[in-house]
Curated annotation (Swiss-Prot):
It comes from the Bacteria. It comes from Leptospira interrogans serogroup Icterohaemorrhagiae serovar copenhageni (strain Fiocruz L1-130). This is Cyclic adenylate deaminase. GO terms for biological process: purine ribonucleoside monophosphate biosynthetic process. It is an enzyme of class 3 (hydrolase). Pfam families: A_deaminase. Its cofactor is Zn(2+).
């Protein structure tokens, strides 16, 4: 879709104004009022929706690029020839003492990134869900549909996943999932991602595991061939269905021969399934050469993380929010180079240990030298994206832009990418170019 330059510019101005005002109101919320957490969530949803819309607008092409715009010549360009909008704007100056928020967001978006804690179902946007519902004859009113996403805690949040999974009726439906994931990666300049795929509910609904994986892998290969983005799968053996089901899922994985499937994860309702119940599953996976990660410390205390690292030998910890309660655990994670997959917005939304970004332990973890990666967890459910996750670190948790670049580097080396050094070397070259455009020292 191509619009006129003025139409797009007017809408972007309104979005920037509204985002600035919402951030101002959010910063003034008192911390000790019963309504504060719900208002913060409301502000976050509005801000994230606006920023996602802005990203979409910048991807559009304009029909009438004016010759005077920022000194960019348009001689020879037909008024009927669409031109990418983002190419018409200069980069902001981030060397200023107080750079503009929107310039920071634009800078962060342009930086190449990786993301390694991401659920496939939660990458499907609502419009795509509705297309899938229409395809499969699923009738849900708009009110019923929106009510599905009004979760109050982690358990009710998991029900959202079950709803999304229920929309899939045949393996080819996963084309909608990979299409949305690839669009999300491109919009945030994510070059490599490790995404969780939870098969249990799909299998209960009558789908065949190998057929699902075959279709997912074929679509993943198509996206890589299209523009080079790399997607790898971690099969979530899941707490939600018990240890016996988890072992069955592992056995299914072990029969595969796809290099795109690199390991397993343990997700689901943390309080329903302590890590010790899955020790045998993880031992068998490790012995088979699979990579192993576990959600832990999201809805339970630091003892749960101890079990994940000591009994499961998890190579990374998803969320790890409660680790801050145990200094010995923080020391152990640092000394054993076990990364924490940080998901700031997700932790605020589920609200067990964190109600405001300012209170998230990521700043403490970074200062303590823990290896970290920054992630969204569930971008379409939380209306967030990876660019804005990094922006929150700058805006609310006092991370400098250089520290954010360091976090991007840490994310690469926390991944299971087979050639981390070469991936980072290529990313670093591009980061230097972006920093130069924005007036920052290399």
């Amino acid at each position: 879709m191509a619009l006129t330059f003025q139409e797009i510019l007017d809408r972007i101005r309104i979005i920037d104004r509204d985002v600035t005002e919402l951030n101002r109101l959010k910063s003034r919320l008192p911390a000790d009022r019963p309504y504060s957490s719900s208002l913060q969530i409301s502000f976050d949803k509005q801000i994230n929706e606006l920023l996602n819309e802005r990203v979409g607008l910048m991807e559009l092409e304009v029909l009438d690029p004016p010759s005077w715009i920022l000194g960019v010549p348009t001689t020879g360009i037909s008024q009927e020839t669409p031109v990418p909008l983002k190419g018409l704007f200069p980069s902001g100056d981030l060397s200023k003492e107080k750079p503009d928020d929107q310039d920071v967001i634009n800078f962060l978006r342009e930086l190449p990134k990786t993301e390694i804690h991401l659920h496939l179902e939660a990458c499907v946007n609502k419009d795509t869900m509705k297309r899938l519902m229409a395809k499969n004859g699923i009738n849900v009113t708009d009110e019923e549909f929106e009510a599905k996403f009004n979760f109050k805690d982690l358990n009710s949040f998991i029900q959202v996943f079950f709803f999304i999974q229920s929309l899939v009726k045949e393996p080819s439906d996963f084309s909608f999932f990979i299409e949305s994931l690839a669009e999300y990666m491109r919009a945030n300049n994510i070059l490599y991602t490790e995404v969780f795929f939870a098969p249990s509910k799909f299998i209960q609904n009558g789908l065949d595991f190998e057929e699902m994986i075959d279709f997912l892998v074929n679509r993943i290969r198509e996206e890589k061939e299209n523009d080079g983005i790399v997607i790898r799968l971690l099969v979530d053996v899941s707490r939600s269905f018990g240890p016996e089901n988890a072992m069955k899922n592992l056995d299914r994985v072990l029969k595969l021969r796809h290099p795109e499937v690199i390991g397993i994860g343990l997700g689901g309702a943390e309080l329903m399934g302590p890590a010790r119940d899955y020790q045998g599953v993880f031992q068998k996976a490790r012995e088979a050469g699979l990579r192993v990660v576990a959600h832990s410390g999201e809805d339970d205390g630091p003892w749960a993380i101890w079990e994940a690292v000591e009994l499961l030998k998890a190579e990374r910890i998803g969320h790890g929010t409660s680790a801050i309660q145990d200094p010995e655990l923080v020391k152990y994670l640092r000394e054993n180079h076990i990364p924490i997959e940080i998901c700031v917005t997700s932790n605020v939304f589920t609200g067990k240990y964190v109600r405001k970004e300012q209170n998230h332990p990521v700043r403490y973890y970074y200062d303590q030298g823990l290896p970290l990666s920054i992630n969204t967890d569930d971008p379409e459910i939380f209306n967030v994206n990876l660019t804005y996750e990094y922006y929150k670190l700058w805006r609310f948790l006092d991370f400098s832009l250089d520290e954010i670049v360091d976090l991007i580097r840490q994310g690469v080396f926390a991944s299971f990418h087979p050639n981390k050094e070469s991936l980072w070397a290529e990313m670093e070259k591009n980061i230097h170019l972006v920093k130069t455009r924005y007036g920052l020292k290399r």
